[in-house]
């Protein structure tokens, strides 16, 4: 099995619900280690740059507005198959379609306020991690 790193963001809705610790417990129970973390209130430019891949999509403006609506918790997770494992923990993008017991099924309101973001591939994980953390701030443990 391959040890990977993935970027995870606990979005403003979940931060406001005070469920950061419950989400971290799920990461750790699944064998994922937090190797970098910080809380931030994203600027409009940061959110637009982070989600630039969606710039032409109809939901882009609302996504950016949501992501700057309050603080987020940003972390790098490390572990065997971390990307797939985190995506399984998160559940489907639409919480109504997410399996029971996933983060989105348990903590998300709707497809827009869906509690968490996770990288979808090793290439995007590397780019997303670099967006928020210089390599000197990521510690294997």
Swiss-Prot record:
Disulfide linkage: none
Cofactor: Mg(2+)
Enzyme's top EC category: transferase
Gene3D superfamilies listed in its UniProt record: Nucleoside diphosphate kinase-like domain
Broad class of where this protein is predominantly found: cytoplasm
Recorded GO MF terms: ATP binding; metal ion binding; nucleoside diphosphate kinase activity
Compartment annotation: Cytoplasm
Membership in a protein family: Belongs to the NDK family.
Protein name: Nucleoside diphosphate kinase
Gene name for this UniProt entry: ndk
